């Protein structure tokens, strides 16, 4: 088991790339099934910076026509979610009357997704769905209110880095997923 150090924290391998890439294949198949054949062109909205690697892998597998856009939101400080969500870089496309697929690296408490769904509704989107690489069901606070539509993999309520996820902006480039080694 490989161990790495980022600043003051040591991490160990949690999920190797080869184990979760099949989860991305499955989610892409679900999206292709649900969005192929429609007259409209949905928007794939990648949340920066964490979802970039997941979104890139997903986009390679999507077979329906789609538009690509980005948005930057943040709710983390170090290893903890702050509970305060901020839009740091708004999307540059018009979502009025459009369907939007929010691509997220990890859904934890759900506060970011609650803000995103509300934000997209205010901007005129007719539908928004959540597609996440990782989902922490133990910490999710909006189970009866906001559905997480496409989940690549459920994980335990532990802090992870790699494949886009970071610890103070470091570790996004790691191919595998690492967990705190405590």
Predicted segments with their positions:
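PRPP-associated nucleotide enzymes
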Residues: 1-182
């Amino acid at each position: 088991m490989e161990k790495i150090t980022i600043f003051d924290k040591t991490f160990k391998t949690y999920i190797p790339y080869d184990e979760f890439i099949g989860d991305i294949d499955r989610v892409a198949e679900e999206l292709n099934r649900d969005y192929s054949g429609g007259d409209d062109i949905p928007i794939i909205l990648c949340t920066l910076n964490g979802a970039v690697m997941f979104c890139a892998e997903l986009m390679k597998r999507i077979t329906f026509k789609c538009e690509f856009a980005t948005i930057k939101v943040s709710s983390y400080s170090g290893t903890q979610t702050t509970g305060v969500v901020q839009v740091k870089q708004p999307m540059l496309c018009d979502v009025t009357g459009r369907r939007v697929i929010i691509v997220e690296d990890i859904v934890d408490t759900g506060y970011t997704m609650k803000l995103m769904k509300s934000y997209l509704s205010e901007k005129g989107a007719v539908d928004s769905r959540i597609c996440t690489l990782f989902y922490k069901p133990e910490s999710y606070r909006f189970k009866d209110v906001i559905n997480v539509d496409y989940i690549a993999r459920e994980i335990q309520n532990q802090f992870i880095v790699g494949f886009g996820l970071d610890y103070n902006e470091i570790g996004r480039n790691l191919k595998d997923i690492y967990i705190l080694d405590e």
